[in-house]
């Protein structure tokens, strides 16, 4: 296509330009950020699992199962993103990594990573409610859908069909396809899982804390310039 893949010119966001031209290399900054962000998510999920019996705050006992269903769903989501892009990746589920652990873990076959992803999603399916408590939260059906996609990527077509077919009747396409690009079309009848983005200026910046700003970056980079 004739549009730029990001930034204001062909010399802006060089990492994305190289990916767009299929000339990227292993030190591409955009690919490094995905690796970093996904493993930050894995680390946080592992922290939650590690301290499962130590948390105590109002309402925790009531929502504990749902909360840990979300933890398992998100860890599966992060590892799935990693294995889709990088193939064999370092795998750890017990404890957290520190800066001193950098470079100490070896990659494992992606089949082992997929096994952990499937296990986490089964745990999420068993723990998550069928109806989301608020927009942006995963449900048991969200976990079902992601597991079906995981099966497809492994060419487990029969397993994928079995788990995805019951979901078909639960979601419908909007009568106006263009509505999905509008605010009023967010979290609509076709939405299985939807990350909640924000356009507020107090959340985004261009350097010192990028991992907390993905939602705003998504709005800025995918919307019409000047529309947010």
State the predicted function of each range.
Residues 32, 83-89, 102, 178, ...:
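Generic secondary-structure boundary/loop-capping signal
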Residues 57-58, 91-95, 174-176:
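Short, hydrophobic secondary-structure boundary micro-motifs
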Residues 83-95, 157-164:
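Short, well-structured active-site flanking segments
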């Amino acid at each position: 296509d004739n549009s730029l893949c990001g930034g204001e010119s062909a010399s802006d966001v060089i990492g994305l330009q190289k990916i767009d031209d299929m000339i990227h290399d292993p030190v591409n900054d955009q690919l490094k950020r995905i690796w970093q962000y996904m493993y930050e998510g894995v680390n946080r999920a592992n922290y939650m699992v590690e301290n499962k019996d130590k948390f105590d705050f109002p309402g925790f006992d009531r929502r504990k199962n749902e909360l840990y269903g979300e933890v398992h769903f998100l860890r599966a989501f992060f590892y799935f993103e990693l294995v889709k892009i990088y193939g064999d990746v370092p795998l750890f589920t017990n404890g957290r990594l520190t800066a001193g652990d950098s470079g100490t873990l070896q990659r494992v076959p992606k089949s082992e990573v997929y096994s952990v992803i499937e296990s986490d999603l089964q745990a999420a399916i068993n723990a998550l409610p069928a109806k989301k408590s608020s927009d942006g939260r995963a449900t048991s059906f969200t976990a079902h859908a992601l597991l079906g996609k995981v099966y497809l990527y492994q060419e487990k077509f029969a397993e994928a069909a079995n788990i995805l077919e019951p979901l078909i009747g639960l979601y419908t396409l909007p009568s106006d396809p263009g509505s999905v690009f509008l605010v009023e079309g967010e979290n609509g009848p076709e939405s299985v899982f939807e990350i909640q983005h924000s356009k507020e200026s107090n959340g985004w910046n261009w350097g010192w804390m990028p991992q907390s700003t993905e939602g705003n970056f998504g709005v800025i980079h995918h919307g019409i310039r000047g529309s947010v």
